[in-house]
């Protein structure tokens, strides 16, 4: 499974929301993510992709859409 598909699956599993048709929509504004959900998402991303998401690198504006999450995970996996 590629990173994009897996990120979509993680979001759907955690938040019961299919974001495949809203990849560029702000997930906070859409009510999908909130502060607690962000923590859950980070933990799951770290576990599934064997990455570490430094808090200093997790800015809401940098990780607020599914596409940005995919980009962030891709960058961290390639680091």
Swiss-Prot record:
PTM statement from Swiss-Prot or TrEMBL: 4'-phosphopantetheine is transferred from CoA to a specific serine of apo-DCP.
Keyword line: Cell wall biogenesis/degradation, Cytoplasm, Phosphopantetheine, Phosphoprotein
Swiss-Prot/TrEMBL GO biological process terms: cell wall organization; lipoteichoic acid biosynthetic process
Sequence positions bearing O-(pantetheine 4'-phosphoryl)serine: 35
Keyword Isomerase recorded: no
Compartments where found: Cytoplasm
The Carrier domain, residue ranges: 1-77
PROSITE patterns registered for this protein in UniProt: CARRIER
This protein's pathway: Cell wall biogenesis; lipoteichoic acid biosynthesis
Main location: cytoplasm
Gene Ontology terms for molecular function: D-alanyl carrier activity
Record GO cellular component, one term: cytoplasm
Protein family membership: Belongs to the DltC family.
Role, per record: Carrier protein involved in the D-alanylation of lipoteichoic acid (LTA). The loading of thioester-linked D-alanine onto DltC is catalyzed by D-alanine--D-alanyl carrier protein ligase DltA. The DltC-carried D-alanyl group is further transferred to cell membrane phosphatidylglycerol (PG) by forming an ester bond, probably catalyzed by DltD. D-alanylation of LTA plays an important role in modulating the properties of the cell wall in Gram-positive bacteria, influencing the net charge of the cell wall.
NCBIfam families: dltC, PRK05087.1
Name of this protein: D-alanyl carrier protein
Organism: Streptococcus sanguinis (strain SK36)
Underlying gene: dltC
